[in-house]
């Protein structure tokens, strides 16, 4: 769906591909932070070089630089996988009202929107088909969702244009070479993505550069302990069918979306598992102050705090291990994703 088609369908002017606040955060692919981009008909143009970056398929802003050398094979395999299985996909022809209703009923997304607040710039690294990016543009937030899958981004932009959403913006980028200026976003999120890169630690170091000093960084990963049941199910799900999966049985009502979930969870060509302590090490390396973990670390004030971005104790190593073993009975049935939240330290 093009902007013109959307305008014909709705009888209104199409929303811009990028809001002014998001466009100001972009730079040329591989360029320095003093480069910028301007929006033209069906393309972006570099303000310094004059180079034109045409939209892929006429609708998707394409700022992707191929990965050469380290990790090229993994990047290519994952890109190919998500072109075939855009994730998480939509349940039929969802409108924005339905998406907001679902997001508001989901404890995680509702808490996240509340914690972000109002009038923020938000970067979602690995946005997939864009549901979270669309939801977070509520409260007058301006959101940029980036992904390398054109199939996923196509669905995200189709939803944007069909529903006239001007503050959720999308572009194809490589997470290891982002066409985004450093220190430009209030909140940087990567929820369930870095474990599909060839080096999650290096990918994390790239995305935190895009957060402003004092800004929020949130990373969601497969847990080293809680992912084990998914691995075991993967050995038999081809025989038993998708109903073995808790999410398919209880959450998904669309056959295509259920198939995409099964493929993502059990047939993904590359994934890595991680622990809270590993992420705490990444925080230390990249100047990130620890704030919170979701689900909360047992025996800490994280269990009682009202805000997802509130400063809490990381607990002891023993508490963190016990917490993650406990996740075998909770988040293990839903993909085993945990999130660690921090704040980028101000320069000393």
Give the predicted meaning of each segment.
Residues 216-248:
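Conserved class I S-adenosyl-L-methionine
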Residues 256-345:
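Rossmann-like AdoMet/SAM-dependent catalytic core
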Residues 164-176:
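Conserved SAM-binding strand-loop segment of SAM-dependent methyltransferases
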Residues 4-87:
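N-terminal auxiliary segments of SAM/dcSAM-dependent transferases
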Residues 176-187:
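A short acidic, Gly/Pro-enriched loop at the edge of an enzyme's catalytic core
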Residues 201-213:
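A short glycine-rich, Lys/Arg-flanked "PGG" loop and its adjoining helix->strand segment in the class I
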Residues 129-140:
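Conserved SAM-binding loop of SAM-dependent methyltransferases across substrates and taxa
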Residues 94-119:
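Conserved alpha-helix/loop element of class I SAM-dependent methyltransferases that forms part
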């Amino acid at each position: 769906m093009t902007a013109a088609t959307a305008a014909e369908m709705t009888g209104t002017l199409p929303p811009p591909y990028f809001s002014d606040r998001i466009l100001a955060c972009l730079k040329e692919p591989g360029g320095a932070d003093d480069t910028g981009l301007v929006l033209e008909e069906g393309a972006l143009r570099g303000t310094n070089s004059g180079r034109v970056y045409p939209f892929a398929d006429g609708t998707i802003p394409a700022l992707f630089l191929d990965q050469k050398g380290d990790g090229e094979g993994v990047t290519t395999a994952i890109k190919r996988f998500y072109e075939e299985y855009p994730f998480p996909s939509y349940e039929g022809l969802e409108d924005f009202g339905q998406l907001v209703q679902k997001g508001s009923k989901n404890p995680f997304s509702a808490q996240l929107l509340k914690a972000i607040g109002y009038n923020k710039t938000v970067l979602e690294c690995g946005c997939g088909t864009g549901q979270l990016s669309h939801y977070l543009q509520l409260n007058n937030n301006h959101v940029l969702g980036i992904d390398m899958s054109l199939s996923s981004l196509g669905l995200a932009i189709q939803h944007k244009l069909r529903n006239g959403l001007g503050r959720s913006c999308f572009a194809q980028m490589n997470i290891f070479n982002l066409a985004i200026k450093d220190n430009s976003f209030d909140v940087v999120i990567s929820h369930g993505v870095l474990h599909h890169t060839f080096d999650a630690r290096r990918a994390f170091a790239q995305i935190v550069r895009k957060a402003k000093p004092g800004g929020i960084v949130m990373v969601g990963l497969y847990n080293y302990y809680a992912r084990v049941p998914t691995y075991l199910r993967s050995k038999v799900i081809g025989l038993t069918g998708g109903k073995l999966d808790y999410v398919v049985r209880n959450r998904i009502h669309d056959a295509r979306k259920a198939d995409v979930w099964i493929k993502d969870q059990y047939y993904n060509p590359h994934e890595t598992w991680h622990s809270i302590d590993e992420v705490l090490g990444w925080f230390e390396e990249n100047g990130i102050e620890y704030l919170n973990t979701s689900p909360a670390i047992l025996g800490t004030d994280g269990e009682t705090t009202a805000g997802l971005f509130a400063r809490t104790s990381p607990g002891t190593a023993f508490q963190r291990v016990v917490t993650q073993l406990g996740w075998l009975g909770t988040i293990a049935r839903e993909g085993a994703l945990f999130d660690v939240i921090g704040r980028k330290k101000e320069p000393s």
